[in-house]
């Protein structure tokens, strides 16, 4: 994997920085594990915008990734590494001994031909998936389940990982990259190591059009709007907001906590916030 600064042949390419991985498969993805997906452009079933700054972008297939990793005791061989347009991490196509192929999140250091295993008897090696009950304390893990059997939900992005801190009864404590310490059931599964493509955060888009290719529309500042559109809008000429930063609906924008899921609050041992 290499970081390439593009030659400044145009203003759009002058600031562009790419992450190039020559180990990625250059052909088409594995067709049986592809699914179609349509863009909603941030609209709900009524046609109202529920997520701003979305729309356009290149069409792409969804890669069906195996987040459960529940084929216990069956060895799998890494056939190839692939780019996935739906996520920041790369994915790996693995071939199980029974002939089935699946996509998984590619951990750091994964190579073509490497053997992987799932289950409580799997060795502690990067890319193997085990119940947290069988993982040594202090191990770096990723693709962590929040409910047993539901599939990985935490630490799935490029370069992310978590650390197993302790086990107490039926729960274990995991420190996430954000600093949050969370309790998870010891029967939840996690994969050893950290997610690959860790240089993803070093790339520079270079121009606005590259974000439009990704389906990201422009973000307009509130002070540039009219009063009817945003609490910061209006004024004669170029004026300040005149109040603390808020969202278009008046919710404080800087550090205001909006989490309302009280049902799982008891699973958070330490919040990611400093205060």
UniProtKB/Swiss-Prot annotation:
Residues 50-59 have a biased composition (Basic residues). It comes from the Bacteria. GO terms for molecular function: rRNA binding; structural constituent of ribosome; transferase activity. Residues 35-49 have a biased composition (Polar residues). Residues 29-59, 224-275 are annotated as: Disordered. Keywords: Ribonucleoprotein, Ribosomal protein, RNA-binding, rRNA-binding. One of its GO terms (biological process) is cytoplasmic translation. GO terms for cellular component: large ribosomal subunit. Pfam families: Ribosomal_L2 (PF00181), Ribosomal_L2_C (PF03947). Belongs to the universal ribosomal protein uL2 family. One of the primary rRNA binding proteins. Required for association of the 30S and 50S subunits to form the 70S ribosome, for tRNA binding and peptide bond formation. It has been suggested to have peptidyltransferase activity; this is somewhat controversial. Makes several contacts with the 16S rRNA in the 70S ribosome. Part of the 50S ribosomal subunit. Forms a bridge to the 30S subunit in the 70S ribosome. This is Large ribosomal subunit protein uL2. It comes from Paraburkholderia phytofirmans (strain DSM 17436 / LMG 22146 / PsJN).
